[in-house]
Amino acid sequence: MFKKALFILSLCPSFVVAQSYVVYDFTHNRVLESHAPDSVQPIASVTKLMTANVFLENNRNANCTASITDDDYDYIKGTHTKLPKYTPISCNELLKAMLVHSDNYAAHALSRSAGMSRLQFIQKMNEKARELGMRSTRFSDSSGLSDSNISSAMDLVKLAKYSLNKAQIKNLSNMPSAFIQAGGRSVFVKNTNKLVREEVFDAAIN
């Protein structure tokens, strides 16, 4: 993926419209190309990468379940989920829905399913950011809906590199589509990343 991305950038630099970006070689630990790499911006659903890490590292119940509640609907107004409400769903299925389909409700359900409150979970996300040296990063929710979730491209390189150690994150985030088992139903979802959905790239992590 990284070779292809660099090739595109070198041939067509005018196609790059991001306010900031980093092309990073994880094999040799070096920046290949960047623009405003330390600029702090809202990171939206990239937040879910940290949510996945914190959940996997803190959940001690392999059989845990969680339900989408009215509180989730009140917080995430204006967004949609295919997952049923008030239905116990396996945390593994919620993780799949979050990483494949970027489901905001799944992210919020997971944030109170690892043996702590939602606020404690957000605190763990910020602690992990500091541990990884992500000095420009702050989290205020687990889905990325809040504009208060901020980071820089260079900080996100650190998060991506750390996430490479978790096969579950790598495998789920790169599935073009998936079936989520919820309340006796199989809910079909597609990856929200078109490049992954159409299998344009063989990504290290998405």
Label the predicted regions.
Residues S10-L11, T51-F55, Q181-A182, N191-T192:
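Intrinsically disordered, low-complexity boundary segments flanking structured domains
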Residues F2-P13:
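Sec-dependent N-terminal signal peptides
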Residues F2, K124-E127, T192:
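Non-catalytic cell-wall polysaccharide-engagement segments
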